[in-house]
C-alpha cells in the first residue's frame, strides 16, 4: 500500500473562517481524550520567527499514538497561523532546526518504502529525516542499520552527532527468539525488558558525504550529546565507574569531535558521586551548566541542583544550593548573561533565570501554571510549553512582561466543554504540617450546595507533585459529578528536600496522614460527603492507596493501579534493585524493615471494594504484586477485581487500553461511591 509523502506545506497557505455562534457546552467525556491533542518539543527557528513543535494524537481506529510536525509564527497571537508539516503515518519526534534554518529535521521510523533503512530482519529503524523549508518531500539524512536514538546538529550545520546502540556480534539463526543471557547486575528496565550488554555510543555523521565516525566506545553508555559553540568538542553524559549498574554516578565528559577510533579519549569534567546530566555550553565555550544530584545515598529524594563547571577544569560551582527546589533543562541566554531553567515549586513549574555567578535569581514565567519545556530565541524571547488548569499544553512566548499564547491546538474542542472549577488549598496535617492540594468540583456545582461524592486521587512518584497542569482524569471525574481531592503529601517534590525525604523507609505513615487531611478538609468545607468517598491512584498512587485501605474503612471504593503490596517479592523482579537497597537495605539482612512496610502483611484489614489494575510487561511496578493482592482479597471473600492489560508496561500506551481504564474507573466508582452507604 503506498504511503502518503511527508511534505512541507507552502508558507503562503491561507485560511478563512466563517463567524459562527459558539457551540452549546457539555461535560467532558472519555472520548474527549482522543479529541484533545498533546503539544510538545518546541524548537525555535534560528531567525526567531517560527516555532516548530510536535502534536500527538491518540487514534482509536489504529490503536496507536500518532504524531505530526507543525510550525507556527511567533508573532501570531491568534488561532489560524499554525501550519502542519508532515502527513499522517510517520510519528516524528525530536524536531531540530539546522543552524542556517534551511532544514527542519526529526527522528522517525518510516514504514516500508524509500528511505525506510530496514535492518537485517527487514524491520524499519528510526532515522534522522529532514524537510527543506523551500518545499518538497522529507528525505532521510541517515541510513544507520540499527537506527538512531538521538542526534544534534553541529554549529556549522555540516555534521550531526548521533547516539547509536551497538549491534550483536553474531546474528541469531534460530526461528524462536534468541535466549537472554544475563550477566549484568541491573538486568531489567521497564519499556525494554531484559537488558543485554549492548551499549549506546556517539558517532559524528557528515551530512554531505554520509560518512559516519565513531568517537566513543567501551562498556558504558553515552547520552545527552551537546556541541561546543566552535564545533570542535562534544559534551556528553556517561557513567564510567567500574560497574555502572551499581550506582547512578553519571558525569559530564567532553570528547573531540574528530576523535576517530578513540584517538583522543574523552576528558572527565565532573567527579560527583551522584548523577550529573543535561549539559549546556556557555556561548563563549568556556563553561558548561548542568543538573547535579550531590546526595546519591538518598536517591530520588535528593534535590536536583544547578551547577556550573569550567571546561578547562576545576571544581564545579553549585548555583542553587540555597534554593532547595528541583531544577531542570538549563540553558544559557544567547549573550551568556544568565542561565534559564525549569523550577518546581509549590504546585507550579516555573521558568527561572540566574546569573552564572549564582546571583540575581528571578522567575520570568511564574504563576498558576506548569511549564514543561522552553527554548530561547535570538532576540531574547522565551518560547515555552505551558499548561494551565483549563489549558492543555500550548506554546506561549514571554518577551519581558507577560505570556502570550501562540498555539491554540485544542481551542475548538474545549470551546464546547464545561470544565471543572479548580482551587488550590492549604490545610494542616495531623502533626500540623501545612499541606497543599487541589480540589476539583463539577462545572455546575454551586458553593453551599449539598456535599458531593468525592474521590481522593493520589499521585505517583512518590517524589513528584500535582500542579496546575491540565488534569484530564480529575476533570473527567468532576464532569461525572464527583469532587476530586488531589494532595501533595510528604514525599512530594516542590516543597524542599526535607519534605520529600520525610517518608524515607516509612511509606504509608506521614503521607497517609497528609492525604487523609485533604479529605477531611474537603468534608469540613462542605464539599465532600463523608459517606461517599473513593480513593485511587497509579504507581506510588496505587501503593499509597493500598496503605490507605489497610488503615481505614472510610472509603466506599478503591482503585489500586500498578501498585506494590509485598515489597520483598519485587527485589530482583522490578528494575529498582539499586533504589530498594539504598532505602530498605539488602532484604536478607534487613527483612524486618521490608516486612514492616508491606501492606500485604495486614491484608485482612482491607474491607474496601478494590479494583486492581496493571500491565503484564510492567517492570517498573510489576503486576505480580497486584496479582498477590487480588489473590489474597479473593481468598478472604472481599469484593475485588483484577484487570491486566496485555503488552503494556508501566504507562499504558494503546488508546483502547487507555479508554478501557477510564471507563472502568468510572464504572467502579459509580457502582460503590455514588450511593450513600
What residue ranges belong to the model's regions?
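Mature N-terminal segment immediately following signal peptide/propeptide cleavage
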Residues: 22-63, 67, 71
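Non-catalytic accessory segments flanking enzyme active sites
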Residues: 43, 161-163, 169-170, 179-182, ...
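Residue-level detector of Asp-centered blade-edge/turn motifs that repeat once per structural unit
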Residues: 46-47, 99-100, 155-156, 229-230, ...
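Hydrophobic beta-strand positions that form the internal "hydrophobic ladder"
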Residues: 48-51, 101-105, 157-160, 234-235, ...
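A flexible loop/linker signature enriched in serine peptidases of the S9 family
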Residues: 55-68, 85-93, 105-129, 137, ...
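Short loop/turn segments that connect beta-strands within beta-propeller blades
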Residues: 74-77, 132-136, 206-210, 256-261, ...
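Cap/lid segment of the alpha/beta-hydrolase catalytic domain
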Residues: 241-242, 295-296, 401, 409-531, ...
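Active-site-proximal cap/loop segments of hydrolase catalytic domains
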Residues: 479, 486-677
Amino acid at each position: 500500500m503506498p504511503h502518503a509523502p511527508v511534505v512541507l506545506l507552502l508558507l503562503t497557505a491561507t485560511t478563512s473562517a466563517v463567524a459562527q455562534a459558539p457551540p452549546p457546552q457539555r461535560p467532558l467525556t472519555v472520548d474527549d481524550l482522543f479529541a484533545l491533542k498533546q503539544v510538545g518539543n518546541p524548537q525555535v527557528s534560528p531567525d526567531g520567527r517560527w516555532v516548530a513543535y510536535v502534536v500527538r494524537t491518540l487514534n482509536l481506529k489504529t490503536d496507536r499514538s500518532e504524531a505530526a510536525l507543525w510550525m507556527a509564527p511567533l508573532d501570531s497571537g491568534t488561532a489560524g497561523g499554525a501550519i502542519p508539516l508532515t502527513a499522517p503515518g510517520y510519528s516524528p519526534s525530536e524536531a531540530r532546526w539546522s543552524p542556517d534554518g534551511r532544514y527542519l529535521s526529526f527522528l522517525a521510523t518510516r514504514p516500508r518504502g524509500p528511505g525506510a533503512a530496514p535492518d537485517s530482519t527487514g524491520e524499519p529503524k528510526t532515522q534522522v529525516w529532514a524537510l527543506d523549508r523551500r518545499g518538497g518531500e522529507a528525505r532521510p539524512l541517515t541510513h544507520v542499520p540499527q537506527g538512531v536514538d538521538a542526534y544534534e546538529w553541529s554549529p556549522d550545520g555540516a555534521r550531526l552527532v548521533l547516539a547509536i546502540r551497538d549491534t550483536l556480534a553474531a546474528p541469531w539463526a534460530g526461528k524462536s527468539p534468541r535466549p537472554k543471557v544475563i550477566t549484568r547486575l541491573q538486568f531489567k528496565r521497564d519499556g525494554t525488558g531484559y537488558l543485554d550488554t549492548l551499549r549506546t555510543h556517539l558517532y559524528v555523521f557528515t551530512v554531505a558525504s554520509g560518512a559516519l565516525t565513531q568517537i566513543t566506545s567501551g562498556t558504558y553508555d553515552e547520552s545527552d550529546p551537546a556541541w561546543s559553540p566552535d564545533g570542535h568538542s562534544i559534551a556528553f553524559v556517561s557513567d564510567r565507574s567500574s560497574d555502572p549498574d551499581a550506582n547512578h554516578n553519571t558525569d559530564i565528559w567532553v570528547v573531540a569531535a574528530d576523535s576517530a577510533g578513540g584517538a583522543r579519549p574523552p576528558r572527565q569534567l565532573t567527579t560527583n558521586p551522584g548523577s550529573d546530566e543535561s549539559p549546556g555550553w556557555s556561548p563563549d565555550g568556556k563553561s558548561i551548566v548542568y543538573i547535579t544530584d550531590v546526595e546519591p545515598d538518598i536517591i530520588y529524594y535528593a534535590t536536583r541542583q544547578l551547577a556550573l563547571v569550567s571546561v578547562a577544569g576545576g571544581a564545579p560551582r553549585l548555583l542553587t544550593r540555597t534554593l532547595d527546589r528541583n531544577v531542570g533543562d538549563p540553558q544559557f541566554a544567547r549573550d551568556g548573561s544568565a542561565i534559564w531553567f525549569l523550577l518546581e515549586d509549590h504546585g507550579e513549574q516555573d521558568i527561572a533565570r540566574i546569573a552564572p555567578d549564582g546571583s540575581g535569581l528571578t522567575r520570568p514565567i511564574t504563576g498558576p501554571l506548569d511549564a514543561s519545556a522552553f527554548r530561547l530565541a535570538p532576540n531574547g524571547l522565551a518560547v515555552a510549553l505551558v499548561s494551565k488548569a483549563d489549558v492543555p499544553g500550548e506554546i506561549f512566548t514571554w518577551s519581558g512582561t507577560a505570556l502570550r499564547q501562540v498555539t491554540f491546538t485544542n481551542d475548538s474542542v474545549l470551546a464546547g466543554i464545561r470544565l471543572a472549577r479548580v482551587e488550590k488549598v492549604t490545610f494542616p496535617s495531623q502533626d500540623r504540617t501545612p499541606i497543599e492540594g487541589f480540589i476539583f468540583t463539577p462545572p455546575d456545582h454551586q458553593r453551599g450546595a449539598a456535599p458531593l461524592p468525592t474521590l481522593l486521587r493520589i499521585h505517583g512518584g512518590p517524589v513528584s507533585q500535582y500542579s496546575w497542569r491540565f488534569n484530564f482524569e480529575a476533570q473527567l471525574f468532576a464532569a461525572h459529578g464527583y469532587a476530586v481531592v488531589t494532595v501533595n503529601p510528604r514525599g512530594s517534590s516542590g516543597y524542599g528536600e526535607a519534605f520529600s525525604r520525610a517518608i524515607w523507609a516509612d511509606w504509608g505513615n506521614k503521607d497517609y496522614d497528609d492525604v487523609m487531611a485533604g479529605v477531611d478538609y474537603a468534608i469540613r468545607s462542605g464539599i465532600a460527603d463523608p459517606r461517599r468517598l473513593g480513593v485511587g491512584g497509579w504507581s506510588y498512587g496505587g501503593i499509597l492507596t493500598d496503605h490507605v485501605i489497610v488503615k481505614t474503612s472510610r472509603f466506599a471504593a478503591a482503585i489500586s493501579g500498578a501498585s506494590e503490596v509485598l515489597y520483598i517479592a519485587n527485589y530482583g523482579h522490578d528494575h529498582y534493585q539499586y533504589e530498594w537497597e539504598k532505602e530498605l537495605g539488602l532484604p536478607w539482612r534487613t527483612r524486618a524493615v521490608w516486612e514492616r512496610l508491606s501492606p500485604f502483611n495486614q491484608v485482612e484489614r482491607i474491607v474496601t471494594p478494590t479494583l486492581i489494575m496493571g500491565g503484564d510487561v510492567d517492570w517498573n511496578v510489576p503486576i505480580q504484586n497486584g496479582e498477590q493482592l487480588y489473590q489474597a482479597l479473593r481468598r478472604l471473600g472481599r469484593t475485588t477485581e483484577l484487570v491486566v492489560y496485555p503488552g503494556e508496561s508501566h504507562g499504558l500506551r494503546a488508546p483502547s487500553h487507555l479508554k478501557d481504564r477510564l471507563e472502568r474507573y468510572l464504572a467502579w466508582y459509580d457502582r460503590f461511591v455514588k450511593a450513600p452507604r
